[in-house]
């Protein structure tokens, strides 16, 4: 019987054997089931980072498994070890977004200045992890991924619910949401760079006006 190890990139994933008259067979490699560590979890994040980056820079059409593997600096077999298909890559990206949204909503609800101020001050694109993952996910909507649409809708609804709890009025909460969307869009017009810094003084003025509106609404004024 002739045998050889299949490795990724230095770890034995499986051992392929060939017995004359029978054909190829596989048996678990010692590193996979014999106590050694499989490819490190960091490699999975590296692949997701590459997928995210390609989506942002080139759109969905350029995110083939081969392209993602090249961008991540891994073999295609290494990519498939973590993500067996392109749909699995998308699921991984959406799972990352849900985790980041959990963290962001927790920060929003615990912010000393309150959810409204936190939401407005973080609405401008800052190249934070959640910013990048959100932009990447929106690129997937170009081909109507229903699962992506559901996750994005859930993320935005959680921001809305946090604002609604803070201000107590659905219309006011929605207005604040739309102002945040507008601030993000305005940032993208700054030389086409969504990460370009915006005028902080203007942001402060927008926040002041919104806070006045919230106070007036709470007091029952028009």
What are these regions (language model features)?
Residues 90-97, 148:
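Alpha-helical DNA-contacting segments of helix-turn-helix folds
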Residues 122, 137-140, 179-183:
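Short acidic/histidine-centered micro-motifs embedded in hydrophobic/aromatic stretches
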């Amino acid at each position: 019987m002739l045998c050889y190890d299949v490795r990724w990139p230095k770890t034995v994933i499986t051992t392929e054997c060939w017995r004359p008259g029978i054909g190829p067979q596989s048996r678990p490699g010692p590193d996979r089931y014999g106590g050694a560590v499989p490819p490190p979890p960091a490699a999975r994040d590296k692949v997701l980072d590459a997928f995210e980056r390609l989506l942002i820079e080139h759109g969905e059409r350029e995110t083939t498994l081969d392209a993602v593997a090249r961008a991540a600096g891994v073999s295609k077999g290494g990519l498939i070890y973590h993500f067996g298909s392109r749909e699995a890559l998308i699921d991984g990206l959406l799972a990352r977004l849900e985790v980041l949204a959990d963290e962001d909503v927790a920060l929003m609800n615990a912010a000393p200045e309150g959810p409204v101020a936190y939401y407005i001050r973080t609405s401008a694109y800052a190249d934070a992890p959640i910013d990048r993952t959100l932009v990447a996910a929106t690129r997937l909507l170009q081909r109507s991924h229903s699962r992506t649409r559901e996750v994005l809708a859930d993320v935005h609804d959680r921001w809305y619910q946090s604002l609604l709890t803070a201000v107590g009025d659905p219309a006011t909460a929605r207005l604040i949401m739309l102002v945040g969307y507008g601030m993000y869009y305005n940032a993208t017009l700054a030389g086409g760079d969504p990460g370009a810094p915006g005028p902080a003084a203007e942001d402060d003025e927008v926040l002041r006006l919104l806070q006045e509106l919230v106070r007036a609404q709470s007091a029952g004024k028009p």
